Amino acid sequence: MKAIDNQIRNISSSHQDKHSDKVNSHQHHGKVDKTHRAKIVEFDKLDNDSQIDNDFGLHIIYFLQHGHWKVNDRSHQMEKVWFYNSEPSIDIQEYNRFADNTTDTFIFTIIPDNNHVLKLSSPITVTVECKGGYYFINSSGDKSDIIYKVDGLSIIARNFFTLLSGNFKPDWRWDVSKETFTKEKFDSYVKSVFSKIDFYKQCGVINPQNANTAYFGDTDGRVGAVLYALLVSGHIGIREKGWSLLCELLKHEEMASSAYKHKNNKVLYDLLNTRDMILNELHQHVFLKDDAITPCIFLGDHTGDRFSTIFGDKYILTLLNSMRNMEGNKDSRINKNVVVLAGNHEINFNGNYTARLANHKLSAGDTYNLIKTLDVCNYDSERQVLTSHHGIIRDEEKKCYCLGALQVPFNQMKNPTDPEELANIFNKKHKEHMDDPLFHLIRSNTLKPTPVYANYFDNTTDFRPARERIFICGETLKGEDPSKYIRQKYGHHGPGVDHNQQFDNGIMGLNSLKEARDKNNKIIYSSGLSCFQLH
């Protein structure tokens, strides 16, 4: 939506006509008199002293004017019922038509998630009409015929996106096409756009004409990093008009990285919200390639991380799911050769993890239904490579294999050295946790973790075994060719790899923090995407 300056137009309190009850800011310190049952209630701006109580329409208006909820204990609980425990139900195309002024009316419905509650909440429909410099807003939750007439200059248009982005249905569609650029032009675009950003300066070379698997480590919630991985591996393309938008997206993620380092969370969230608005525009220029031959494995911590939002995470997961060999993916034109694994951030966090830790409500919505389809490990029998986010070890004392908070006792396996059987059991155990309704409620911040799940979440994050133990585990496992040991590739706490990595080591840790040596030969860390493909 075209920007509207956040200015307040003063309207005389003495003015009143037969069509409206006018409520000025100073009058609105008290409750709106709904007993009057007027057709239209008009006012300029709500402030911190406004008593809006259980009025859903007024809560919406306050958010649109201020960019956040009116904070008090009661409203916090109501937001959880209305938005944060709701099903994705808003059509983003309808929002875009309203934002582009193609239509002056926008109707959306919030459908509360009633799967795990005793008292059912009814869907709430909100109608917004923009006309003559005013917004006319009505909510079915008001249980009255009141329509609020709000000065358009008091509402910040971008706050519509901030309010609703987490509740957009994850039903993006992508055209399927062939690359229209020459190889030279495509390579030039990729280099000119990504080489300016520190996060991509040390990436290993990925050849989209090579059928060897490309591995990608932690991306920390950066949408740009997932787009980069899919671009260089030949799975997606971007039409010419989209590259300038991609530059803007990357610039905002880089500024968000700086805000994160300086612990300026308000700036971080604002930048990520703007990033998502840019992504919403960029989407129309992204297409899937029908001739991708390079298998890709994403090793986890791509969502639920420091640069995540619900909107960005849903986009990443929906895009990746279109290329996965998974139930429900019926698009035969796309090579289903992308594997996406869950890391501790996917498992533990819904949306931005710094916001969730602070119980800060950055945006509504839930990524659970997309996350729960992910496995935690994958075994490639052809290449004899075992991949996971954490790396798998053997605990001889406890007589089990360990992956994050999961354990597989040796005696639960038909063949205790079979890597494929081991991967299947780990994935089955992971799915049992993800399917637990209690797990879902805790992950969405609806309930505090039980002691058992608090321990589970902690162990999922804190599991950082030594490289030697991961290597020994690979030596113990036996594939179809017992003369070759099983190689492991993982993310999480790995030392990271850069463009100098030439050999396919027995173990490879592809973290976004890379170990390096300073002039005094001390280990230092730099942030950057780790990726590897054998050439």
Curated annotation (Swiss-Prot):
Compositionally biased spans, kind Basic and acidic residues: 15-34
Location of region: Disordered: 1-34
InterPro entries per the UniProt record, alphabetical: DUF4049 (IPR025123), DUF6860 (IPR049206), Metallo-depent_PP-like (IPR029052)
Domain of life: Bacteria
Protein name (database record): Putative uncharacterized protein YhiL
Encoding gene, per UniProt annotation: yhiL
